[in-house]
Amino acid sequence: MERGIPTPQTNPYTQSRMTKPPIRVLVAKPGLDGHDRGAKIIARALRDAGMEVIYTGLRQTPEMIASAAVQEDVDVIGLSILSGAHNTICPQLMTLLKEKGMDDVTVLVGGIIPGADIPSLKQAGIAEIFLPGTSTQDIVEFINKKHAA
């Protein structure tokens, strides 16, 4: 062995022992709703759990969210929707993601979503809906399980 060249036996941080890159999550507030406290709390919890978080800010269109997802090469998109526009925004976003070849991205929705709307959102491709009162730990665990490997 040449001196100074690390091997798996001499350097515990070689590629074979490194962890995979962090899960990349885009957190967005679509629509006209200006209440972003919940989205910021989720973004911080995900970051604290070791995920890489990109927060897009308020008043994002589905087009803006899809473009940001492509640019940032994210694994997960989290939407915070309190305005009642979920039945319009979510299907539009899912269509745009598919058109951009990003239909493997996990899309989550949090906010005030009537129970009657949940089946159609899941049918549109939303992976999970988190209602008010869901713990941040439950969201972190869902994402970690979905992206374990």
PLM feature spans:
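Intrinsic, low-complexity polybasic segments
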Residues: 3-4
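Intrinsic-disorder-associated, low-complexity terminal segments enriched in Asp/Asn/His/Tyr and depleted
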Residues: 11-13
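Cofactor-cradling patches in redox/metallo enzymes
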Residues: 39-144
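The C-terminal output helix
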Residues: 145-149
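Intrinsically disordered, low-complexity segments enriched in serine/threonine/proline/glycine
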Residues: 7-9
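Short, flexible coil/linker segments at domain boundaries that flank nucleotide/cofactor-interacting
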Residues: 18-22, 102
